[in-house]
Amino acid sequence: MDKIINNLNLMSEEELLDPSISAEKLLNGHRAYYYDLFDPPFYILSRYDDIDKALRDPETFLEGYGNGPNFINSNGIVSDGDHHTFIRRIVQPNFLMGSIKNLERRLEEITDDLLDDINNKEEWDIHDDLSFPLPVIIICEILGIPTDDIKRFKGWADAAVAQMCSEEPETFQKELDKMDDYFLTLINKKRSMPEDDSLISRIANSKINNEYLSDDEAVRLLAQIFVAGNETTTSLISNLVWRLLSIDNLWNDFVADKLQIDGLISESLRFDPPLLGLFKTTSKDVTYDDVTIPTNTKVMMHYGAANRDSEIFDNPNKFDSTRDGKKVISFSVGIHICLGRELAKLETRVALRALKKRFPNLKLINNGQRVGPFLFWGRSKLPVSHN
């Protein structure tokens, strides 16, 4: 067992290109694995039941020190206890099912506009031309942010996720300071105006004990929603198109209405989770068999491994869109379950429907390029062609 697990290297070229290799090693090893190839070192949970239980125990597994491997004093939605509950109530109305359904027509319009731009191209890129701009535009509209410079916004989001996974997070701070300054300017502008229906206006004007959120927390909350609102969905769309085009006959079966789109989305989330895992921090010692994780230690909840746990999923290394997806854990569970999960699914549904209708002969040119940070799993490039 130890021989299998001792060569785990989440940042190796092999495991970055195929995270299922890491998942298999973890699932064949200890329930709690000590990973010392990162500074600071951390533990990894990989079993589905262990992760599910940990995510439902927010008093033991804390969010407030950041959900990456580095220790930070976090706030906004990445927080704990009553404060997290209050912050979540500020943003939740925009992500309830009723609000999400009202966005479907607008999503269809954005998607059609994006695909119109590439209609006459023989070759184009799923990421650059569709899966990146679609979620960025819609999250900007939800927040009330101008959409005139989405490439700059995408650069900020990329810097944020890179910082989250880096042993040298300070190298990304200069770029992120620009994002913070931009958001703070918008927040101050909204505070000087009557409150409107935008989410940024609600964030700017919300109060705790009759005081506005601090500038830092308002900016962090806005940044968290902005980054989460596009990174996950971008990879979900790209990953699913990639699998549909790379697995024999899967795209043709989809075009022929032999596969249900919701089943495909659920299975893509299981098989290719856009986030391979997030981190918690222990508030007390926690023991798994003969391994004790000390207090104040970072623990990675490895969603990618949990989604391939054979105790939960039959034949887990096979992409099967007919399986029951209710236990897929990619959006987390418990009080920190992803607020934008239904929006991400709807965006993917709209994108896939449009591709199927307009480009039934879609072909993969090559496998493109993987996103960089080890916690994330998606395509930063995915070139395709159509006749």
Question: Where are these predicted regions, by residue range?
Answer:
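Cytochrome P450
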Residues: 1-387
